[in-house]
Amino acid sequence: MKHLVLGSSGQIGAHLVKYLQDKGEQVTEYDIEYKQWQDLREAYNPTLESYIDTCDIVHFLAFDVGGAKYLEKNQNKHHFITNNMRIMVNTFELLKTYNKPFIFASSQMAEMSYSSYGMLKALGEKITRDLGGLVVKFWNVYGYETNPQKSHVITDFIKMAKYDGVIKMRTDGTESRQFLYADDACEALLILAKKYKKL
């Protein structure tokens, strides 16, 4: 199966590429972090069109996002909102044009109307359903991360413990959270890709 992974350097995407390759799947990576011309914010991109046209399934993981500290700082800023709107509009248009099976990575935050990130993901879910794609809602995916500006809570805790000897929480610590290891998320994505036509 030929997989196109949009957002292939991100928290889930980087793990997904390795996971799929380890399983013997064909993978095309696509991420602005690797090549500047792989910018989903740009409406005209013939290379992306070719990748979408020739793949079997698209994993739409690309989004301008990070952990809580990144969202607190950026999610209500013009650049954050417009970056993600452009990514969605351009990508969904190509998915519609080529009528390609795809999985859209959403978030439990799509239920949180006070969050710009959540509202953007909720819009993405609506468009995905309209185009016949699959929505997967993730919550607190963790695994190895390389970008400290966008890192998530587990990575942050490990770094604090290692370098500071103290873990400073952003909350009072009384709430409970669900966490999903990145490889487990990847396993679920591959199962969905393989069973896509039956769902």
Name the predicted role of every residue range:
Residues L48-N83:
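NAD(P)H-binding glycine-rich loop region in Rossmannoid oxidoreductase-like domains
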